[in-house]
Amino acid sequence: MNATTERQIVVLGAGFGALSTVRLLRQHGCTAPITLVAPRAELHYLPGIIWIPSGLRTRADLVVPLDSFFARMNVRHLAASVTGLSADGRVVHTSAGEVANDALVIASGGRFIRKLPGIEHAITPCEGMAAAERIRDRLREMSGGTIAVGFGANPNEPSAVRGGPMFEFLFGIDRQLR
């Protein structure tokens, strides 16, 4: 695509995968321009949300500004949301316009699938900080009652159990309420 100019690398996302990609590219001597596309120049440290219900952490504690990281790594941040791809992935369509690339890394994370019956009545921590804050607020409002904690498995991969965060929430809430 860029026969006469320097190769352009585009990274989608601002989580662990995206930031590790940037760091490794630079550590291995890559000097090509890197554009990172994400709505905000911040990392949401999701492993720490287990501490929000107890009040040991707040959103402010878990949002890491990335401006200095981008400056150190010589990365251009495009504050935008991705809306699509074209030209076999060589053009990224965003809410701020199109971005051409010679190499594309999609590290935008996964999406939580809300397919379990009744899940619309549940607060699901996998959805991020706002969910953990809702759990915190509901716990503060309670004067008694029952708390149900559960998780579902992937029927296409029955040997894998991904309930770790739910156990962390469960044990943290148990400790908090004792």
Annotate each language-model stretch with its function.
Residues 1-7, 74-176:
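FAD-binding core/adjacent interface of flavoenzyme oxidoreductases
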Residues 2-75, 156-178:
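Beta1-alpha1 glycine-rich phosphate/pyrophosphate-binding loop at the start
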